[in-house]
Amino acid sequence: MGVFMKVAIVGGSGFIGTNLADLFIDKDINFTILDKVKSEKYAEKWKYCDVTDYASLVENLSGHDLIINLAAEHKDNVRPISLYYQVNVDGAKNICKAADDLNIKNIVFTSSVAVYGFVEKDTDESGVFSPFNHYGKSKLEAEKIYDAWFASSSDKKLVTIRPTVVFGVGNRGNVYNLFRQIASGKFLMIGSGENEKSMAYVENIAAFLVHTLSFPAGYHLINYVDKPDFTMNELSTVIYTCLGKRNKIIKVPYVVGICAGYTFDLFSKISGKELPVSSIRIKKFCAKTQFSSSNISNYNFSAPYPLRDAIVKTVSQEFMDK
């Protein structure tokens, strides 16, 4: 852990934060979870904190040497839209101000590959910014705030990590919904299924976050992706093989799928209820989302789980005999 004495995991009650806390416990790293929501697994390590409330931040960050910021509004359908900016952007401003006021010189920020938007080729850290939604736009704004914080002094350390979509046991996001549909045997493949998808396994990204504690002062930017990328067809084959099922995917033309998505958007707007299908989710599903990192090789990191093994572990624990 080097010179650091105590780590604050802001937004640490969630999926990535809990997996990170598991590793901190194993490695005897002193940490506090700062979150609006009480940590179910590590209640004794938790303190209430809201990144939009500067007073609660500065009070609870006192005594820490390094901040890992995992807090974010990230779902597709956050309302009002201003919440993305209140949490992701104003939260970044508050964290940077608190860090300066408390003389904390080290910040690790989890951004997102959403800052690149839809990509047509494998995209590394030099990719062009073109976020298509408010999540990506707010993450990009937050990055600029952290960059300005770092540039204000020569002795600071800023690690900005842009993970691709994260999955693992216990997560109930878009990847879980995809795995569940495939595992159910009632999966409709919209499009050809040849689009490649980059993913990141939660235990691997947690291990990388631990690894960042040893980084020296300076600026560090890394896309986090577990390679190799699978096409949707390959991914479904891995899942069906794991479950011992026959691959029986029904394929639907893209134009039919996207029209269905717009129909669900209308129903959702009329009913005021979130529905499992939307046009944006179908666009994401059918898009080629392929990312890589040119920078990660500089940090001597080896992910503990190969991607195929991580998928099999997740599918086995979530869907086997269910």
Regions found by a protein language model. Give the residues of each.
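NAD(P)H-binding glycine-rich loop region in Rossmannoid oxidoreductase-like domains
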Residues: 40, 51-90, 98, 116
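N-terminal Rossmann NAD(P)H-binding glycine-rich loop of SDR-like oxidoreductase domains
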Residues: 8-26
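Mid/C-terminal beta-alpha module of Rossmann-like enzyme folds, strongest
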Residues: 212-276, 307-322
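Active-site Tyr-X1-5-Lys
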Residues: 132-159
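Glycine-rich Rossmann NAD(P)(H)-binding loop
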Residues: 168, 190-195, 222-230, 240-243, ...
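Substrate-positioning beta->alpha
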Residues: 171-177, 191-213, 220
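Conserved C-terminal active-site "lid" loop/helix of NAD(P)H-dependent oxidoreductases
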Residues: 202, 237, 260-301
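Conserved Rossmann-fold NAD(P)-dependent oxidoreductase catalytic core, especially the SDR/UDP-sugar
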Residues: 94-134, 154
